[in-house]
Amino acid sequence: MKIIISGSTGFIGNNLSNYLADKGHNIIRLVRKTSKNISRNFETHLWDPDNHYLPDKPFIGSDAVIHLGGRKIISLRWTEKIKKEICYSRVNSTEILTKFISKMEKPPSKLIVASAGGFYGNTLDQKVDESDNVGTGFLAKTAEEWENSTFKFKLNKTSVIHTRFGLVLDKKEGAFPLISMPFKYGCLLYTSPSPRDGLLSRMASSA
């Protein structure tokens, strides 16, 4: 399959690109700028959603588009400016992709758009699934707007899939190095009522 991946130089995107390529798929990367985080020789195209620029060539004959783009949410401080960037970068880029695909004569059969488990808000130990309603808070609102941005344009030939990721952990990348830092200095104070002892144990042993 010919698969286009945006956000392909991020933590999840880079690992997913390599995994799918190892499975024999033809991976096309959409990147905002030339990145050093490209571990193998993938076909790469620049796009600029802020200026509504998306190249035609990589989409010709594509089977699926996976959209993972958006400002990193791992930050020491979520200022109002950063929160706006987190939301805008996801909603705007998704709208650009969806609009483009809606106008294609032969569009890809699948559009897979990242979302977040934060869609459900703070559920503590309550189990949720795709039938549950959106929660409250910044992440819930962002995830809702992000998913809704795919509904603004009619996609008759393309199935849309929203993937509500939970916390993805890796010892060297993503959120783990930051959230495991207190363990290294022996100063963690944990008071959450939600039972996450197994997660905490794994974090402590890996720190």
Report residues per predicted region.
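N-terminal Rossmann-fold cofactor-binding loop
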Residues: 30-34
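Conserved catalytic-site loops of classical short-chain dehydrogenases/reductases
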Residues: 64-66, 109-113, 161
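Conserved beta-loop-beta element that borders a ligand/cofactor-binding pocket
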Residues: 115, 148-171
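Single conserved hydrophobic/aromatic residue that forms the stacking wall/gate
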Residues: 190-207
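Short-chain dehydrogenase/reductase
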Residues: 87-91, 132-147, 169
